Every structure is written in structure tokens, then in C-alpha cells.
Amino acid sequence: VYVTGSNSKFLSKDVITEFRGRGDEIHVYPLTFKEFMQVYEGDMYHGWAEYVVYGGLPLTVTMKTEEQKINYLTRLFEETYLKDIIERHHIEKSQELEDLVNILASAIGSLTNVPKIEATFRSVVQSNISGNTIRQYIEYLEDAFVINKANRYNVKGRKYIGTPLKYYFEDVGLRNARLGFRQIEETHIMENIVYNELRSRGYSVDVGVVEKRGLNSEGKTERTYLEIDFIANLGSKRYYIQ
């Protein structure tokens, strides 16, 4: 028996509880770039350009025109993902959720936290949304497989740092569609793609931080923090990726 769904909380709380010990949970990801190229009718150069913009949802690969792909991804995000979250959680101020998605989509690959997002709402959106509401909405987006987070890990101290952290989209095509395909920054999107690739291979993925102490121009001790793009862990395996 296969039970599918688009909400992790529903699956984990209801289905897994019902079949405890008698079933497995399988996270089905969008196509990786390698899988995409097995279907794409073209060379790797053009395939990469296509993948960066439209992502790896299987149906997009079969579509022949850009207009079809744009319309499909835009409708999917608005009419399936957002509506499902709004209806499931009875969100009255849906515009706040949409604004949050826009903020997160514009900041992939950038360190952020709830206070920063709250400040952005106040200064850019002119909204007094609370930090607790932002945290709740982020949790809803994670449960719906829209975004995932990468926590910061202090390599020398061997401990996790609470915030800031990074958020990545489950599919870059959906991220781009949400922004009207206006912010196609290849370096940031590539970072998102690498993160998704590692997770699809079973790795847990963190953002690495190395604390460095030295003397400043005044001879005083100063802390600086160097970032490692990703620390990928799988059992006894650990990889540092820059």
C-alpha cells in the first residue's frame, strides 16, 4: 500500500502513526540534474541553463515551450502549494504568507533569522507581523515541502549555532516562478541545487562556521567568522564543500 501526500506533518502524524513499525517514509524529490539530463533532449550546456530556470519537476521536462513551463510552475505554486497551506491552517492574512515566501525566495543562500525577516516586513512591506507568526509560517512552508533549512555548525566548537541560518527551496523552478522569473542569479541558485543534490543522496546538510581570532589594527583581539558553504553528513562520512 502506497500513501502519498504533500504535507509532512499529515504524513508523519497520521499515516506513520497508524502504520508504526509496518511502513517506511520515502521523501520523493524533484529530479536531480543528472536525472534531468537523462530525459532532456539536448546537450549539458543547454540542459543546465534550462534546469537553473525551470528546476526539476518532472512535468516541466516534457513541456516544449517556455510559456508552458512558466504557466505550469506559476499556477502550481499559487493554486496548489499556497492554497493548500492557507486552507489547511486557516490563515486569514494570506498576503503575509505570500510576502514571507517572496522574502525567503529573494534570500536563498543568505544567512537570515526571524528578527531580520521581521525587520524586512516592517521596512519594506510596512507590516507589523509578529516573530511568532513568522516562525509558524516558516514551519508550514517546511511541512509542505516548499523550503528546507540548513543550520549553522561551528566546526571548531563542534556545536550548532541557533541563528542565523539559511533556507533553500525544494525546487528552484518553483522559487523562480514565485519571483516571476526576475531574479535568476546563477550562483545562488547553484548553491540551492547543490544543497538539494546532497539531500537527495541522503546527507544531512549544515552550513559550516570557523571562528578565527586575531589582532586588529589597534592590537585588540578580534573574532572573525569564516563560512564553509556546506557540511554534508551521512553516518561516518563527512564532507566539507566550498
Q: Where is each model-derived feature located?
A:
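Interdomain motor-coupling "hinge/lid" segment immediately C-terminal to the ATP-binding subdomain
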Residues: 6-8, 12-111, 115
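Accessory nucleic acid-recognition modules appended to NTPase machines
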Residues: 66, 70-239
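Acidic beta-strand-to-loop metal/phosphate-binding motif
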Residues: 242
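Residues at the C-termini of beta-strands that transition into short coil/loop
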Residues: 5, 29-32, 171, 209-211
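Conserved nucleotide-sensing/catalytic segment adjacent to the nucleotide-binding pocket
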Residues: 1-2
